[in-house]
């Protein structure tokens, strides 16, 4: 990972440790977990959270049970140093009732398969009355929708706008075949970093409005319908990341991206023209790992491995 990526991660996802990160949940639910080194429990059966403790909280993970939501309504605005909050998706319908502190930068929505029936039962309502519509936080720079286990996508039920998220720069979500949420994002002029999961369509024509602003682009778990056609228009890209791409990656397309500093390809199939990477003059970081061809052999042959490893770039890993 080069210095560019490190700065991005630190900006939107600051380090989590037990001194500043808490999970608002019940003691019973906490004890059911095997081990959690990153968070300190904040028992939602408590009737009071001291001002001193509120001041310590920088990252808060909220459970979906017990008194978590009522405690948030009472104490959230006192957590003046809070920069990151993780909310269960089931709380989206009443998120407008929470008194968010001004310093918060990162909003993570955790969607779990146990909410599938809830969103299915409310599909008609949430389609007509979108979640987060006419709501937002001025200082939010990162919006992250995380799907756990077999959770069904909820992006079609969400509506956000530049008016209510004027400083949004980093967005992560699952695309599949839906274009509604992606179309909303195209109205933003501030977005610099996109992470797209489960892409089942030709997504680049829909991303054209980002061609002059997008600096990093990540694709995760995209199947045979995914294509890179159109990526050449994103000439300001500095980092490109692929994880679990099953439709092949032609590295020649990277030659159309002159500012590329970082290329990451992992757990993907049928990587061709890998030698094109040798011509990227601004490359600072290269990570190639666990990529297979049609015969499930390593995509990187001995000749290309030698050439790539001989590149004079600061950070390189070929596995």
Describe every region a protein language model picked out:
Residues 49-51, 76, 98-101, 134-137, ...:
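Hydrophobic anchor residues at the C-terminal helix/turn of individual leucine-rich repeat
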Residues 1-38, 66:
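Cullin-RING E3 adaptor/co-adaptor recruitment helices
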Residues 22-24, 35-47, 59-71, 81-94, ...:
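Concave beta-strand-loop units of leucine-rich repeat
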Residues 13-17, 80, 312:
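Generic secondary-structure transition motif, activating predominantly at the C-termini of alpha-helices
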Residues 4, 9-13, 97, 207, ...:
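A short, flexible N-terminal coil/short beta segment enriched in small residues
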